[in-house]
Amino acid sequence: MKIADIKAFLGRYFDPVELVGTGDIEIVGPAKIEEASTGHVSFVANEKYYRYIAQTGASLVIVSQKAPLDDASPGTSFLKVADPYTAFVFILQHFSGKRRIADTGIAASASVAASVRLGENVSLGEHVVIGENCVIGDGTVIGPGTVLMDGVTVGSGCTIFPLVTIYDGTVIGDRVTIHSGTVVGADGFGFAPQKDGSYIKIPQMGTVEIGDDVEIGANTTIDRATMGATVIEKGAKIDNLVQIAHNCRIGGDTVIASQAGISGSVKIGRQCLIGGQAGFAGHLELADRTSVAAKAGISKSFLEPGLAIRGVPAQPMRDQLRQEAQVRGLGEMKSKLEALEAKLLALQQQLGE
C-alpha cells in the first residue's frame, strides 16, 4: 500500500487530507514513532512527541494540521489531518487483519444441543459447549472451550475468545467482543442475614443484557440480576479484571478500566470514564459524562453531568485537590504553630516575672 493509497483511504473519514512529501513510497505496516523505519507508518498526536518528527525513521507520519514540519526527518512524508490519533486507528484496523480464533464451521469436538439455532457462517471451536435453546447470529465466532448455558442469545458478528462462560438466559447484541476467562451471568452476591448470624442465599432469577458493539476484557465478571436484568448498554468498553455486580446498568459508550469494582444496583450514565481500581458502594448513580479518577472510592451519588471526581471518599476534583494542597501544607503549619507556641510561652514567662 503506497502513501498515496493511504491518503485516499483516510479521505473517506477526513477532509482535507494534506500530503507533505512523496506519495510513491510503499508502506508495509504501522510502528511506534520512536521505533519506526523505512516502510513504516506512524503518528504524532501529542505536542510532547513533536521532537520525533525530526528523529523518526518512518516513511510516513500522520500529524495534525498545526504540526511543525520545518525540521522534519529527511525522507519522511506526512499526512496532515484534523485528528491524527483517530486516523491512525483506522490505519491500524486496515493492517491488523483478523485473528484466527476458530475455523469456519463446527469443530468435531464441539457439543451443540439439538434445539440450538445457528446463523450462517458461524464458527464454533474445539470443545465448545452450546446448551439448549441457544441462538447464535450470522458470522459469530466462538473460541475453543467456551460454554454457553441454556437459553443464551448471541447476535451477529460477535467474537467470543476461548474459555469464556456465559450463563443461562444471557442476551448479547451484535458485534460484541468478549475476551478469555470472562464470566457473564453468574449469580449476584445476594444473601439474607439471619438472627443467628447465618445467611440464606437469595435466588438470582434475573439475566444479563449486553448491547451492540460492547467489548469486554479478559477475566471480567458480570453478575446476573436478582430480578430483571444487569444491563451493559451499547458501545460500552470494559477492561480486564472488572467486577460488575447484580442489577447494575452501565451507560452507552462508558469506559471502565481494570480492577474497578461496581457494587449491586449502581447506575452509571452514558460516556462516563471510570479509572482503574475505582470502587463503588451499592445503589448509587453517576450522571452522564462523569470522570472517575483511579482508586476513587464512590460512596454517594453524583448527579451533575460532566463532573470529575476523585479521592476516598470521592468528591469533586476541584474540592479534593484543594484539600490535598491543604494537607501538604500541614507540616509547615505545624512548624509555624510550634514557633508561635514557643513565643507565647516566652511571653508568658516574661509577664510572670
Curated annotation (Swiss-Prot):
One of its GO terms (cellular component) is membrane. PANTHER family: UDP-3-O-ACYLGLUCOSAMINE N-ACYLTRANSFERASE (PTHR43378), UDP-3-O-ACYLGLUCOSAMINE N-ACYLTRANSFERASE 1, MITOCHONDRIAL-RELATED (PTHR43378:SF2). It comes from the Bacteria. GO terms for molecular function: N-acyltransferase activity. Keywords: Acyltransferase, Lipid A biosynthesis, Lipid biosynthesis, Lipid metabolism, Repeat, Transferase. NCBIfam families: lipid_A_lpxD, PRK00892.1. The active site is at H246 (proton acceptor). GO terms for biological process: lipid A biosynthetic process. It comes from Chlorobaculum tepidum (strain ATCC 49652 / DSM 12025 / NBRC 103806 / TLS). Its EC number is 2.3.1.191. Pathway: Bacterial outer membrane biogenesis; LPS lipid A biosynthesis. Homotrimer. This is UDP-3-O-acylglucosamine N-acyltransferase. Belongs to the transferase hexapeptide repeat family. LpxD subfamily. It catalyses: a UDP-3-O-[(3R)-3-hydroxyacyl]-alpha-D-glucosamine + a (3R)-hydroxyacyl-[ACP] = a UDP-2-N,3-O-bis[(3R)-3-hydroxyacyl]-alpha-D-glucosamine + holo-[ACP] + H(+). Catalyzes the N-acylation of UDP-3-O-acylglucosamine using 3-hydroxyacyl-ACP as the acyl donor. Is involved in the biosynthesis of lipid A, a phosphorylated glycolipid that anchors the lipopolysaccharide to the outer membrane of the cell. InterPro entries: Hexapep, Hexapep_transf_CS, LpxD, Trimer_LpxA-like_sf, UDP_GlcNAc_AcTrfase_non-rep.
